[in-house]
């Protein structure tokens, strides 16, 4: 059912739902548009509405080929909406869900486009604060780039900042998506342009590997890894690309490249990446407690199916019940800033090291079962050896038919007087 948005726009059909609201296919005076209608609880917040109006000039002035332009901001009764250019295509999360990972050339081309858009935004004083695959749109009607990549555009500018008002989120709250949060955000520092670079480098890692460098498991563990762990190398990519990733994933914001520098460096690497196949690495599973039940031990006779599709994980949702395969899931929300002792890494650390395809993961059910079998085999061998020694000793000392009395040892009882 169509609904009016202000006096100039009509929303016809829902395109998707996100954490801050619903995106509609709409119509305006100049043709089709995308209309992001914010949630009712946000629209009823007068402080947010005031901030919404204040951001109007900055958002409307952000015009770049790799940014989804905001055409208008509408405040009408209970409606609070951003009217944006309509991009005919899909988002990067949908492509990742379909392909799992991209060839390095295509991945770098997509991220270089997004870095170009971020450079324009940062020059205008706008920090995105929620860079992730869900917020990168691929224009299927645009010309193909390196590696067959479609032009990439960054969307949802201003939404994170609008939600993060002083009244709605105190200084003890984190706003964002756990897998892509820069360490300084986890530690409660104000977001600067460098947080977007860290998030974009995380996206690049995910495009190459099929998983994020610090994701997996409980959101609290994810946040701790961002602060305490170093990124583990990805096998199979050129050292120049890896060093670029490491620099942009640096814990210190000042050590990261600026968006314009990142874009230029990535485009310089494109020729050496031409023709490279997607990486062949397995996703490390989330950590399991050592006393966790072992599925293989619980039902040793159960048949193992090899036809079941591999489960893939995208961003870790903070909202209970969100389905990993749902690209519209609510991942952009708030969470308490962890205390310093909660951010301290354990003795073993929590980083998830990529493995070569088919290699067993230490701590996995399969690896634990193999370890258990080796221990049983070693134990059985030890028992057999002890038994053999015992039999040999008996034959040597007490195996004759008229053998004498038992020999006195330290552990035998003294003879009665």
Curated annotation (Swiss-Prot):
Entry's Gene Ontology molecular function annotations: ATP binding; protein serine kinase activity; protein serine/threonine kinase activity
Family annotation (SUPFAM superfamilies): Protein kinase-like (PK-like)
Domain of life: Bacteria
Low complexity bias (residue ranges): 294-308, 349-368
Biased composition (Acidic residues): 280-293
Entry keywords, A to Z: ATP-binding, Kinase, Nucleotide-binding, Phosphoprotein, Serine/threonine-protein kinase, Transferase
Catalysis: reaction(s): L-seryl-[protein] + ATP = O-phospho-L-seryl-[protein] + ADP + H(+); L-threonyl-[protein] + ATP = O-phospho-L-threonyl-[protein] + ADP + H(+)
Ranges of biased composition (kind: Polar residues): 408-417
Record PANTHER family: MITOGEN-ACTIVATED PROTEIN KINASE KINASE KINASE 20-RELATED, SERINE_THREONINE-PROTEIN KINASE NEKL-3
Family: Belongs to the protein kinase superfamily. Ser/Thr protein kinase family.
Name this protein carries in UniProt: Serine/threonine-protein kinase PkaB
Natural source organism: Streptomyces coelicolor (strain ATCC BAA-471 / A3(2) / M145)
């Amino acid at each position: 059912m169509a609904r009016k948005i202000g006096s100039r726009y009509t929303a016809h059909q829902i395109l998707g739902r996100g954490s801050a609201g619903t995106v509609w296919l709409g119509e305006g005076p100049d043709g089709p548009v995308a209309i992001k209608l914010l949630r009712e609880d946000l629209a009823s917040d007068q402080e947010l509405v005031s901030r919404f109006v204040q951001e109007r000039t900055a958002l409307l002035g952000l015009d770049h080929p790799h940014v989804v332009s905001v055409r208008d901001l509408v405040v009408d009764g209970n409606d609070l909406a951003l009217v944006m250019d309509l991009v005919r295509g899909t988002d990067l999360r949908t492509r990742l869900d379909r392909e799992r990972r991209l060839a390095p050339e295509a991945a770098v081309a997509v991220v270089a486009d997004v870095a170009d858009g971020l450079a324009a935004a940062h020059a205008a004083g706008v920090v995105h604060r929620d860079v992730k695959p869900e917020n990168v749109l691929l224009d299927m009607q645009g010309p193909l780039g390196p590696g067959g990549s479609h032009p990439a555009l960054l969307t949802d500018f201003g939404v994170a900042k609008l939600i993060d008002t002083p009244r709605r989120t105190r200084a003890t709250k984190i706003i964002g998506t756990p897998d892509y949060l820069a360490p300084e955000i986890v530690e409660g520092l104000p977001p600067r342009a460098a947080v977007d670079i860290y998030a974009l480098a995380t996206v690049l890692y995910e495009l190459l590997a099929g998983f994020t460098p610090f994701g997996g498991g409980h959101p609290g563990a994810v946040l701790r890894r961002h602060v305490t762990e170093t990124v583990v190398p990805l096998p199979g990519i050129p050292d120049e690309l890896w060093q670029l990733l490491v620099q942009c994933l640096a814990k210190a914001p000042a050590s990261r490249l600026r968006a314009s520098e990142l874009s230029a460096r990535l485009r310089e690497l494109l020729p050496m990446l031409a023709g490279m196949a997607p990486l062949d690495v397995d996703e490390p599973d989330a950590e399991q407690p050592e006393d966790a039940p072992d599925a293989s031990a619980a039902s040793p006779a159960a048949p193992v199916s090899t036809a079941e599709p591999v489960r893939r994980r995208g961003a870790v949702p903070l909202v209970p019940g969100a389905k990993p395969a749902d690209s519209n899931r609510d991942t952009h929300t708030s969470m308490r800033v962890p205390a310093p002792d909660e951010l301290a890494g354990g003795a073993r650390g929590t980083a998830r090291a990529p493995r070569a395809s088919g290699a067993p993961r230490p701590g996995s059910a399969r690896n634990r079962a193999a370890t258990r079998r080796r221990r049983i085999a070693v134990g059985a061998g030890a028992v057999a050896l002890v038994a053999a020694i015992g039999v040999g000793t008996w034959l040597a000392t007490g195996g004759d038919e008229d053998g004498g009395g038992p020999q006195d040892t330290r552990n035998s009882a003294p003879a009665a007087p």
